[in-house]
Amino acid sequence: MQENKTFLHVFDQHTLRNIVKLTSDGLITELIGPIGTGKESYVFYSKDVHGYEVAVKIHRHNIQSFKEIPSYLSLRGIKSGGFLNTIDDWTRYEYKSLERAFNSGVRAPKPIGLYKNLIVMGFVGFNSVPAASAIKDSNFDLEEWYKDIIGFIIKMGKSGMIHGDLSPYNILNFDSKPYLIDFSQSLKLTSLTKEYLTRDINNINNWFLKLGKQDLVTEQEVLDSVYGEKK
């Protein structure tokens, strides 16, 4: 019964039509199985027409989520209207953020395609097995990971964006390297969004401190690296 309820919540008629569009465009063949869930979205494992593994993120047409989205979009300078258009705008904003992060040199899923409330991106995993989140798999080199992740924060900042929700839950451990995921809370870098950048930095520093790393960069050092070239 719960599975049927989930199916109806995710695969409404609009989403089903959008999946058909992705299939006809050759971006995916079919949705093979779920690999991640959240309050506003589901992520499914799939393959493209050439057999390459991909992931498909579906933003749900959920009325509860919709109530929160207008303020979310307003904070990001996006005007929208209407239920479906607002969900689509939210999805487009996330895709563009993923694209910007990826192009700036951040290790993240490769952005492949976008249609309405669907995002197609590279699959982080191997042979249908998704990479585990860093909160579940902490078998990695502390020094290398810390250097990489702080570097990712700076690269995103210099490209004009902030992840906005950076934590070990949104970092995957694949091939012993960190991959950032879920850019749905990302923001444009301005003096007004500095607190979100500060929060990301502190989340990472606090996490690595718990893991036993001592020589951490300071919040101010990261802010100087980011804003120094933005002024």
Task: Enumerate the language-model features and the residues they cover.
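Polybasic/polar functional segments that serve as interface/processing modules
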Residues: 2, 7, 195-196
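Conserved ATP-binding subdomain of kinase catalytic cores across diverse folds
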Residues: 6-131, 154, 158
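Charged catalytic carboxylate motif
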Residues: 93, 148, 203
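AlphaC helix of the protein kinase catalytic domain
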Residues: 128-140
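Conserved alphaE helix
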Residues: 141-152
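C-lobe/activation-segment region of protein kinase-like
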Residues: 145, 157-163, 174-231
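Catalytic-loop signature of eukaryotic-like protein kinases
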Residues: 165, 169-171
